[in-house]
Amino acid sequence: MEEYYMKLALDLAKQGEGQTESNPLVGAVVVKDGQIVGMGAHLKYGEAHAEVHAIHMAGAHAEGADIYVTLEPCSHYGKTPPCAELIINSGIKRVFVAMRDPNPLVAGRGISMMKEAGIEVREGILADQAERLNEKFLHFMRTGLPYVTLKAAASLDGKIATSTGDSKWITSEAARQDAQQYRKTHQSILVGVGTVKADNPSLTCRLPNVTKQPVRVILDTVLSIPEDAKVICDQIAPTWIFTTARADEEKKKRLSAFGVNIFTLETERIQIPDVLKILAEEGIMSVYVEGGSAVHGSFVKEGCFQEIIFYFAPKLIGGTHAPSLISGEGFQSMKDVPLLQFTDITQIGRDIKLTAKPTKE
């Protein structure tokens, strides 16, 4: 039954996807005498944590009960008081934790607090599932850098447009709708200025009940972005532009007047590691890279990605000059080519979605 209750807690945690910002997804279930007496999830950044909801629901039944939590209860004061302290004061006798929190502010302290208070703590139940649930948060806490997902849609022969630049639409409506979920679960969407010029996208999540839009990140070496682009004018979501010392200072001022954040790198070209470092400093834990092909090529060349999600349509575009999924310098030797492991292959309508992650095996 321990795995059953933890699985329920994991399912509850998913309710907060796309809404907890820099906080992890957490679910909690309180059980007493074989009966569930409390449940909760962290649903929105700044609001009550999962343990708070579950214990408040349990009320007096929390005394002598067990609680199942998908991540180690916090031990510090942040937007809310520490959950470990709440658990201690509630009279709960046993705590089942899927995994420890690598956040330096927690990192075992929550577990230590509860043990010192005489509470029995068991760890590791469905730890792998808990790890997958919060892979973006955990990657950020362990590396100090955002979790990067590369997304693209292409024909079966790997083309993202015809030789004339026509790309609407390669994949089906079902595939395009599926891709929207990842805009919701990432804190930022990143594209090159070429994509802005070609498609004039809004780069927003169009799913219902989205409480906060992801930050729109544009890579633009010489600040050539059109000033009437949607990402500049619509004010729906924040827009951040990374440029270089080659950018026009007057244009910077005009864009800033629109509320655009300009980050100027002191280099001739935009270096992906520099961009990711700055995004991390700004609190961005996850980046959804939508292209174009040169941008994808830069991320791949630098090894700056944790996951790819590619949609393939059963179409053959052909053409030497039709753009491919990934362009740029590429690799000169096969020994340098990154090896990926497929983690999911799904058919969506007539299209195929491939998900893969880098592996050393």
From Swiss-Prot:
What are the binding positions for NADP(+) in this chain?
A: 153, 169, 195, 199, 221, 292-298
Q: What is its EC number?
A: 3.5.4.26, 1.1.1.193
Source species taxonomy = Bacteria, Bacillati, Bacillota, Bacilli, Bacillales
Sorted alphabetically, which keywords does the UniProt record give? Hydrolase, Metal-binding, Multifunctional enzyme, NADP, Oxidoreductase, Riboflavin biosynthesis, Zinc
GO MF terms on file?
5-amino-6-(5-phosphoribosylamino)uracil reductase activity; diaminohydroxyphosphoribosylaminopyrimidine deaminase activity; NADP binding; zinc ion binding
Enumerate the CDD domains for this protein: Riboflavin_deaminase-reductase
Ranges where the CMP/dCMP-type deaminase domain occurs = 1-122
Tell me which species this is from: Bacillus subtilis (strain 168)
Protein family according to the UniProt entry: In the N-terminal section; belongs to the cytidine and deoxycytidylate deaminase family.
Catalyzed reactions per annotation = 2,5-diamino-6-hydroxy-4-(5-phosphoribosylamino)-pyrimidine + H2O + H(+) = 5-amino-6-(5-phospho-D-ribosylamino)uracil + NH4(+); 5-amino-6-(5-phospho-D-ribitylamino)uracil + NADP(+) = 5-amino-6-(5-phospho-D-ribosylamino)uracil + NADPH + H(+)
Please give the subunit comment from the record. Homotetramer.
User: Which pathway does it operate in?
Assistant: Cofactor biosynthesis; riboflavin biosynthesis; 5-amino-6-(D-ribitylamino)uracil from GTP: step 2/4; Cofactor biosynthesis; riboflavin biosynthesis; 5-amino-6-(D-ribitylamino)uracil from GTP: step 3/4
Q: Which Pfam families match?
A: dCMP_cyt_deam_1, RibD_C
Q: What does this protein do?
A: Converts 2,5-diamino-6-(ribosylamino)-4(3h)-pyrimidinone 5'-phosphate into 5-amino-6-(ribosylamino)-2,4(1h,3h)-pyrimidinedione 5'-phosphate.
What ranges does the record give for the region Reductase, renumbered to this chain? 145-361
Q: Where does substrate bind?
A: 167, 183, 203, 206, 290
Q: Name one GO biological process term.
A: riboflavin biosynthetic process
Q: How is the cofactor bound here?
A: Binds 1 zinc ion.
Q: What is this protein called?
A: Riboflavin biosynthesis protein RibD
